[in-house]
Each structure stands twice: as structure tokens, then as C-alpha cells.
A protein has these predicted regions:
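Secondary-structure junction motif
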Residues: 55, 68-90, 154-163
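Central regulatory/effector-binding core of bacterial HTH transcription factors
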Residues: 1-30, 98-99
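Extended ligand-binding regions for polar small-molecule ligands
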Residues: 63, 143, 147-171
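A local structural motif
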Residues: 1-2, 87-97, 130-131
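Short helix-loop capping/hinge motifs at secondary-structure junctions, enriched
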Residues: 51-61, 78, 138-140, 151-157
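Short loop/turn segments at beta->alpha junctions
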Residues: 6, 61, 100-101, 119
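Flexible hinge/capping segments at coil-to-helix
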Residues: 30-44, 48-70
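Beta-alpha-beta core module
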Residues: 30-37, 41-43, 103-151
Length: 171
């Protein structure tokens, strides 16, 4: 069974024993979990309406975003990471809303309500899409971890999955 949610939702489900394993985007508090850090990095950027001037850019800078209506994640640990990227300009941003999952924020972007700060792989713009992704510059990247409860006894299938994952990352 696949379950989608933000890191806080996924960790809560793991803690309650409702799911065995979670795939979480950093930054995230993983102190009470066993984890495997994946090798790839996710890229931060802006989800913009395809017709906007921002959509025509190769990348966006702090200066490009200062006056735009922005939607950002509701996760405070990630907001702190974004604030570090913006430095002293963060307090001058026009943040109009927060989101827990990018899907609804992307719909708001599509309807011209604002621009969402997001990870690239969380949206899947097609040729018929009304939104696009433009990376931040300087580049902001984040890692991904696979987590599970410490000292958890798993089914043979889950145990095998974790071992296969560990083996594949050693190769």
C-alpha cells in the first residue's frame, strides 16, 4: 500500500504502526528512526504559471521573487531552510498561503493566485500543463531518506525490501 503525505504525516503513521517505511525529504527530524540516505538530491524552485514572465527564465533569484505572491510549505523545519536561502530578504516576502501537499498549491498557481516554492519532482508538468518549474539560483538542494521505526520487527517482505535497498545503495 502506498501512502502520500508530507514528512510529518508519514512519521505519525510510522509511529502509530500504520505504515512500515517512509520516504522523507530533508530537512526532517529522524533521530528516533533507522534510516538510509538516498544518493540523489532534489532541487528547489518555483512552480509558475506557464504564461508568466518567471516561466520564461532559466532560473529565478531572490530578487525575482521579492514582490510575487508566494505559497510555501507549512512545515516549519523546511520554512527555516527556505529562509536561510533567502537570507535577510525572507522577512520581505509576500507569503500569501502555506500548503501541506503541493498538489493544491499547484492548482492555485494554475489559476494565477500565486507562485509556489517547491521541489522539482513533486509536480509533473506535461505539454498541456498550465504550470512549469523554474529552479532557484543559487541552487538549493535537499536530500531524501528512507526511514522506519528503530527496533521494529517486520514481515519477511518488508525486511527483504530494506535489505535490497541497502544492497542497491552499496553498489
Amino acid at each position: 500500500h502506498l501512502y502520500s503525505g508530507n514528512a510529518d504525516d508519514v512519521k505519525e503513521k510510522i509511529d502509530k504502526g500504520l505504515i512500515d517505511i517512509g520516504l522523507l525529504t530533508e530537512p526532517v527530524d529522524i533521530e528516533k528512526y533507522e534510516f538510509i540516505r538516498l544518493n540523489h538530491k532534489e532541487v528547489w524552485g518555483i512552480v509558475a504559471p506557464i504564461e508568466s514572465p518567471i516561466a520564461q527564465k532559466e532560473y529565478v533569484t531572490v530578487e525575482d521573487l521579492i514582490d510575487l505572491p508566494l505559497l510555501i510549505t507549512s512545515r516549519s523545519i523546511v520554512q527555516n531552510e527556505i529562509a536561510n536561502w533567502f537570507k535577510e530578504s525572507y522577512d520581505h516576502l509576500n507569503i500569501i498561503a502555506t500548503y501541506n501537499l503541493i498538489y493544491n498549491a499547484a492548482i492555485m498557481v494554475e489559476h494565477g493566485i500565486g507562485y509556489a516554492i517547491s521541489l522539482e519532482k513533486l509536480i509533473n508538468p506535461s505539454s498541456s500543463s498550465k504550470v512549469c518549474f523554474v529552479p532557484l539560483s543559487p541552487r538549493l538542494e535537499t536530500g531524501t531518506v528512507v526511514v522506519w521505526k528503530k527496533h521494529q520487527i517486520f514481515s519477511p517482505a518488508t525486511s527483504r525490501f530494506i535489505e535490497k535497498l541497502k544492497d542497491s545503495l552499496k553498489a
